[in-house]
Swiss-Prot record:
Protein name per Swiss-Prot or TrEMBL: Isoleucine--tRNA ligase
Subunit structure comment from the entry: Monomer.
Role: Catalyzes the attachment of isoleucine to tRNA(Ile). As IleRS can inadvertently accommodate and process structurally similar amino acids such as valine, to avoid such errors it has two additional distinct tRNA(Ile)-dependent editing activities. One activity is designated as 'pretransfer' editing and involves the hydrolysis of activated Val-AMP. The other activity is designated 'posttransfer' editing and involves deacylation of mischarged Val-tRNA(Ile).
Gene giving rise to this polypeptide: ileS
Catalytic activity: tRNA(Ile) + L-isoleucine + ATP = L-isoleucyl-tRNA(Ile) + AMP + diphosphate
Length: 1040
C-alpha cells in the first residue's frame, strides 16, 4: 500500500491501467480463468466501418462492456467477439466521394469494379482499426483479435448456406414488385431500411381532370384526382374509387357560362371546389347526381398525358386499361376520393393492377430518368413543373399548389426515394410471420414495452427484398440459365459446392466478392451456361447472420444478451430474428435491450451542420474514460434519449473526486500508521462499522439484482449514493476522530479494517462501469495472495454481514443528525457552534441510548433529553372530516372540542377514538398544534420530531470560534500542500482562548502556538458568529 500524493489525473490513470492490462495480458488471463465455467453468449451488434465513433456508439459499447465485465466477474465464460458491418451502401457512398464519382455508372467507367471493390475493402479495414482504437480508449473489452468480419469467406459462406436453406424451405422467390428505389445509388431498398428515414419535403399538390371517354353518355364529364407525384401521371393506367362511398356528379358553371361535370366523392366536394375557385373562374356548382363508387366501375377515361406518350395510346386500346376500378384503400382523408393509379409506381397501385390484370408500366431507368415519351432522358422529379404546365395548357388542372409532407429518403445518401417496379429476390416473410410473433413473446425485452413495439412492427412488415444492384456486399449465390426459355437457377450453399458446380477454371482465392464470383460459369441441365445474377445481398442480411455466422455455427446458439439503439428494434433485432426463423425456426436471442438516442443539451439531434456534435474522444481527453462511461449509464434510464450535458459530466467528476478523496484519506492514514489488513480487527467493530459493512454488502446484492436485468441507471445511482452519502458524508465523518488515536488502539485499527474492506468491496462492484479507477485502487490495496487484477475477482455478497437491525438503527441516528443540520440551516446556526441541547420523543429512547455519541458529535450537540416536548398545545377542529361524520351536529361537536383541555385530549386520542357527550371523536377529527418558544426549532422525523435549543451562550460562542480557527488553519495546511504528519508553528491575533482551548486546536491541526514567528503563510478573515458579533482574525503558519 502506497501513500497517495497530489491530485488525481483520470486521463493519466486510463493510460497507466491500459498499459498494465496490456503488458500483463489481463484480458486473456480472465478469459482463461473462466473458460471452464458456463457460457454467456453475447452478439455484438456491428457498427458500420464508415468513420469514427460518435457519442451514441460510445454509449452502446459502454452498456455492452459493463454487462460483460459484470458477467466475467460472476465467473461466466463470456463469448464476446467484436463485430463489424463492412459491406453495403454506408461504405460504397464514402468511397464514391473519395473518387469524386457522381453516379453508379462512374464506378464502372471511371474507376472499374475491381478497383472500387478493393478500395471499399481497404476503406472498411482502415476505419475498423480507427474505431477499434477509439473503443479501446473507452476501456471496452471485447475479443478484438477474433472479431467477426462479414468480408471474410467464412462469413460469406454462412450467408450462402442460409440462403440455400431459405430456398429449400420454399421461402425464397424472384418476383416483380413495386418497392423503394434510390435513383442516386441505383438500387432497390428493403422496407426496414426506410423506417425512420422519412423527412419533410415540399412537393407539388395537383388536382387533375381525366375526361370520360364516352362523351355521349357522359358529356363533358371528368374524373378529378389528387396527387403529389405528377411525374407518375405519364404511367397512369387506372383510377380507383371506394365501392361504398357516395360520389357526386358536380355540375360546375364558369363565369363564361361554360359547363363541366366533375366526379368527386360527395364528402369532399366542398373542399375541392373551394380549392378550384382559387385558380378557376367558377360561378356556381351543383351536385346533379349521386352514385355509389361500385356503379362507376369499368367506365373508361382518357389519360391526361395521352399525346405525350405513345405507349399510353397502345394501352388505351386495351379494354380494362384507363378504367375506373374499385379499391378498399381509397379513403376520405383528403384529395377527391378518386385515386390515380400507376401500377408500376406504387405498392397499392401494383396490387390493384394485379387484381385487374393491368400492365405493370414503369418507364424509367435506374437513375430515375424517363426512357420514353415527351420527357425522355429527364429525371422524373425535374419533370414535375413541365408536366403541370402541360396539363394547364390542356385545361386539365383544377388546382396546382405545394404541400409539405413526410417522404422516404435513402438511409445512406439521403436522396428522396422513388417507388418503382423491378424484379428482385425476396424472402417470403409472410409465410413465417406468425412464428416470428410467437417466438418474440419468449424473449426477455428491456424495457418490456419494446416487445409490443417489435411485434406490432413485425405484423405490418412485408416480404424482405434482399437483392441490391450494387457492388460491395455478399454476392447472391444464384446462377441463372442464360436460356430465357429455360429459366432454371442454382443456389450455391458453400465454397465446396461452388467448386463442384463451376465449369471454368477460375481460382477460388480468399475473396468471394465481385468481380471474382461473376466470372464463374456453371452448366444448366438444359445444356446452356449459367451465370451469376449480378446482385449482392442487402447489408442488413449480413448483420442478421451474426448469431451463427460469427461463431461459424450451423446450429442455433441463442445469445444470452444483445443491446442496440432505438432505431434497431425493427432493423437489426428483426433481421437476425427473421433469418434465424428461416434457418432454425426460432428466435436467436434470450434477452434483448434497447437504448435511446444521444442528443445535445437542448434535445436537438447532433449534426455537423448545426455544430453541436460531441466527440467522445474529446470528452475522454478532458474527463477520462470512466467518467464518460459512468455518465452515459447514470444520466437517465437507458431506453430514454440522452441529452448530453457538460454540467452533468462535471457532477460525475465530483462523484469520482469524492471517491478518490475517500480512498486517499483511508490509505494515507493507514500508511502513516503502518497498517496491514487483518481480519482479527473485526472483533473490535463498533455499530457504525457493522453498518457500513452491512451497507456495502446490501449494495452489492442490489447491484447484482439490477445488473442482471440490466437496469444500469439503478446500478449507477445506487453506487453513486453509496459513495457520496454512505461513505464520504457519513461513515468517514463518523470515524475521523478514531484515525487520530494512538497507533495500536484497536478502535482505530477496526476502523481501518472496515475502511479497507468497504473500499475493496466498493471497487469490485464499481469495476464493470469504471474499470480504470477500480483497477487503480485495487492494485494499491491488494495484498499477497489476491488475484493479479480486479477482473480476476468475483462479485460476492457476504450475507452474514448484512444486518438490517443495525442498518435501521444507524439510519435513524443519521436521520436525527440530518434534521438537526436542516434546523441549523433554517436559522443560520452553523455547525461549528454547539447546540446546548435537543429533545427527542420517548419512542427514540433506545436509539439515543445506543447512538447518543454519534448524534452529539455529528450534530455538535452537548446534551440530549429524551421526553415528550412540553410546548403549548392548541387544537383545531377538522371541519372536513367532522362534516362527513356528524353532518348537522357539527356545531355541537365543535363546541364540545373547543371546551376540552388540548393536551389531555391529544393524549386520549393517541390511544384511539373516545366518546364525549354521546359523540364518538376520532383522531382525524382534530388537528393539534404545538406552539414552540422562540429559542426552539422543531424538525419532523419519521417518528416524532426533534426540538433544537438554539439559545447562544458565551461558552457556545467560544466553542464555535475554536472550530472556526481549526477550519482556517486546516485550509492553510492544504494550501501549503503539507502531509498529514508534518507539524506547523502558528501565530494568531483577534480571538483570545484559554489554555485548554489552545491545546485542543494544537492537537487538531498538528501545530504549536508561538508568540511571534516568521510565517510562510499569513491570512486574515472576518468571522461572524450566529449572534452577529464579528471577529477580525489573523493567522500565520510556518512549517516546523
Amino acid at each position: 500500500m502506497k501513500e497517495i500524493k497530489g491530485k488525481v489525473d483520470f486521463r493519466e490513470m486510463d493510460k497507466e491501467i491500459k498499459e498494465f492490462w496490456e503488458n500483463n495480458e489481463i484480458y486473456q488471463k480472465v478469459k482463461k480463468l473462466n473458460e471452464n465455467y458456463p457460457d454467456y453468449y453475447f452478439v455484438d451488434g456491428p457498427p458500420y466501418c464508415s468513420g469514427s465513433i460518435h457519442l451514441g456508439t460510445a454509449w452502446n459499447k459502454t452498456i455492452k462492456d459493463t454487462v460483460l465485465r459484470f458477467k466475467r466477474m460472476q465467473n461466466y465464460n463470456v463469448l464476446d467477439k467484436a463485430g463489424w458491418d463492412m459491406h453495403g451502401l454506408p461504405i460504397e457512398v464514402k468511397v464514391e466521394h473519395e473518387f469524386n464519382l457522381q453516379s453508379k455508372k462512374d464506378i464502372e467507367t471511371k474507376v472499374g469494379t475491381d478497383v472500387f471493390i478493393e478500395k471499399c475493402k481497404e476503406f472498411a479495414l482502415n476505419n475498423k482499426e480507427v474505431m477499434e482504437n477509439q473503443f479501446k480508449n473507452l476501456g471496452i473489452w471485447l475479443d478484438w483479435e477474433n472479431a467477426y468480419l462479414p468480408i471474410k469467406n467464412d462469413y460469406i459462406e454462412a450467408g450462402w448456406w442460409s440462403l440455400k436453406r431459405a430456398h429449400e424451405k420454399e421461402l425464397l422467390s424472384k418476383d416483380l414488385r413495386v418497392g423503394y428505389w434510390c435513383p442516386r445509388c441505383e438500387t432497390s431498398l428493403a422496407e426496414h431500411e426506410v423506417r425512420g428515414e422519412y423527412q419533410d419535403v415540399l412537393d407539388p399538390s395537383v388536382y387533375v381532370k381525366f375526361k370520360v371517354a364516352d362523351d355521349n353518355s357522359y358529356p363533358n364529364t371528368y374524373f378529378v384526382i389528387w396527387t403529389t407525384t405528377p411525374w407518375t401521371l405519364i404511367s397512369n393506367l387506372l383510377i380507383a374509387v371506394n365501392p361504398e362511398f357516395d360520389y357526386g356528379f358536380v355540375e360546375v358553371i364558369f363565369d363564361n357560362e361554360r359547363k363541366e361535370t366533375w366526379v368527386i366523392a360527395e364528402a369532399l366536394v366542398e373542399a375541392v371546389i373551394k380549392l378550384a375557385k382559387k385558380q378557376n373562374n367558377i360561378k356556381s356548382y351543383n351536385i346533379v347526381k349521386k352514385v355509389k363508387g361500385k356503379e362507376l366501375e369499368g367506365i373508361k377515361y382518357v389519360p391526361a398525358l395521352l399525346e405525350e406518350n405513345e405507349r399510353q395510346k397502345e394501352f388505351f386500346q386495351l379494354e380494362k386499361v384507363h378504367t375506373i376500378v374499385l379499391g378498399e384503400h381509397v379513403s376520405l382523408d383528403g384529395g377527391t376520393g378518386l385515386v390515380h393509379t400507376a401500377p408500376g409506381f406504387g405498392e397499392e397501385d401494383f396490387e390493384v393492377g394485379k387484381k385487374y390484370n393491368s400492365p405493370i408500366y414503369s418507364p424509367i431507368d435506374d437513375e430515375g430518368k424517363y426512357v420514353e415519351g415527351k420527357w425522355k432522358g429527364v429525371f422524373v422529379k425535374d419533370a414535375d413543373e413541365d408536366i403541370i404546365a402541360t396539363l394547364t395548357d390542356k385545361n386539365l388542372i383544377v388546382n396546382a399548389g405545394k404541400k409539405k409532407h413526410t417522404y422516404p429518403h435513402c438511409w445512406r445518401c439521403k436522396t428522396p426515394l422513388l417507388f418503382r417496379s423491378t424484379e428482385q429476390w425476396f424472402l417470403n416473410i409472410s409465410k413465417i410471420k406468425n412464428n416470428i410473433v410467437e417466438h418474440a413473446k419468449n424473449t426477455d425485452w428491456v424495457p418490456n414495452w419494446v416487445e409490443t413495439r417489435y411485434i406490432n412492427g413485425v405484423k405490418f412488415v412485408g416480404d424482405w427484398n434482399i437483392s441490391r444492384q450494387r457492388y460491395w456486399g455478399i454476392p447472391l449465390p444464384i446462377w441463372i440459365c442464360e436460356n430465357k426459355d429455360c429459366g432454371k437457377y442454382k443456389i450455391i450453399g458453400s465454397v465446396e459446392e461452388l467448386k463442384q458446380e463451376m465449369i471454368n477454371d477460375i481460382p477460388i482465392n480468399d475473396d468471394l466478392h465481385k468481380p471474382t464470383v461473376d466470372k464463374i460459369i456453371m452448366k444448366c441441365d438444359c445444356g446452356c451456361e449459367m451465370k451469376r445474377t449480378p446482385d449482392v445481398l442487402d447489408v442488413w442480411y449480413d448483420s442478421g447472420l451474426a448469431p451463427y455466422a460469427s461463431i461459424n455455427a450451423k446450429e442455433l446458439k441463442k445469445a444470452d444478451f444483445i443491446v442496440e439503439g432505438n432505431d434497431q428494434v425493427t432493423k437489426w433485432f428483426y433481421s437476425q430474428h427473421a433469418l434465424s426463423e428461416i434457418v432454425f425456426d426460432d428466435i436467436p436471442y434470450k434477452k434483448c435491450m434497447m437504448h435511446g438516442f444521444t442528443l445535445d443539451e437542448t434535445g436537438e439531434k447532433m449534426s455537423k451542420s448545426i455544430g453541436n456534435v460531441v466527440n467522445p474522444d474529446d470528452v475522454v481527453e478532458e474527463f477520462g474514460a470512466d467518467l464518460l462511461r459512468f455518465y452515459l449509464l447514470s444520466a437517465n434510464k437507458a431506453w430514454e434519449d440522452l441529452r448530453f450535458s457538460i454540467g452533468e459530466m462535471n457532477d460525475v467528476k465530483s462523484v469520482f473526486n469524492t471517491l478518490w478523496n475517500s480512498y486517499s484519506f483511508a490509505v494515507n492514514y493507514m500508511v502513516l500508521d503502518d497498517f496491514s489488513p487483518n481480519e482479527e480487527y473485526f472483533n473490535y467493530l463498533r455499530d457504525e462499522d457493522k453498518w457500513i459493512i452491512s451497507k456495502i454488502n446490501s449494495l452489492t446484492k442490489e447491484a447484482i439484482e439490477v445488473l442482471e436485468i440490466p437496469h444500469l441507471h439503478e446500478y449507477t445511482w445506487k453506487v453513486r449514493d453509496f459513495i457520496l452519502n454512505d461513505l464520504s458524508r457519513w461513515y468517514i465523518k463518523l470515524i475521523r476522530n478514531r484515525t487520530w488515536m494512538e497507533k495500536e488502539d484497536p478502535d482505530k485499527l477496526s476502523a481501518y479494517q472496515t475502511l479497507y474492506y468497504v473500499l475493496m468491496k466498493l471497487v469490485v462492484i464499481l469495476a464493470p462501469v469504471a474499470p480504470h479507477i477500480s483497477e487503480k485502487i485495487y492494485q494499491n490495496l491488494k495484498i499477497e495472495g489476491m488475484p493479479q487484477s480486479i477482473f480476476m475477482t468475483k462479485i460476492v455478497v457476504e450475507e452474514e454481514y448484512i444486518n438490517k437491525e443495525v442498518e435501521e438503527g444507524i439510519e435513524t441516528a443519521r436521520e436525527i443528525v440530518d434534521a438537526i443540520l436542516k434546523g441549523r440551516d433554517k436559522v443560520k446556526y452553523t455547525l461549528r457552534y454547539p447546540i446546548s441541547k435537543i429533545i427527542l420523543p420517548n419512542e427514540l429512547g433506545d436509539i439515543v441510548n445506543k447512538y447518543h455519541y454519534i448524534i452529539k458529535e455529528q450534530g455538535n450537540v452537548k446534551n440530549i433529553e429524551v421526553k415528550e416536548f412540553e410546548g403549548n398545545i392548541s387544537l383545531k377542529p377538522n371541519f372536513r372530516t367532522l362534516g362527513a361524520s356528524f353532518k348537522s351536529d357539527v356545531p355541537a361537536v365543535v363546541k364540545i372540542l373547543n371546551s376540552q383541555n388540548p393536551k389531555e385530549l391529544k393524549d386520549k386520542l393517541a390511544e384511539g377514538e373516545i366518546t364525549i357527550d354521546g359523540f364518538t371523536i376520532k383522531p382525524e377529527h382534530v388537528e393539534f398544534k404545538i406552539d414552540i418558544p422562540d429559542n426552539i426549532v422543531g424538525m419532523e422525523l419519521r417518528k416524532g420530531s426533534v426540538y433544537i435549543d438554539i439559545e447562544l451562550t458565551e461558552e457556545i460562542i467560544k466553542d464555535g470560534l475554536k472550530r472556526e480557527v481549526i477550519r482556517r488553519i486546516q485550509s492553510m495546511r492544504k494550501d501549503m500542500d503539507l502531509d498529514i504528519e508534518e507539524k506547523i508553528k502558528i501565530t494568531m491575533e483577534g480571538i483570545e482562548f484559554n489554555e485548554d482551548a489552545l491545546k485542543d486546536i494544537e492537537k487538531e491541526v498538528r501545530g504549536t502556538f508561538e508568540p511571534t514567528i516568521e510565517c510562510d503563510n499569513i491570512q486574515e478573515w472576518n468571522i461572524k458568529t450566529p449572534n452577529g458579533e464579528v471577529y477580525n482574525l489573523k493567522i500565520g503558519v510556518k512549517k516546523n
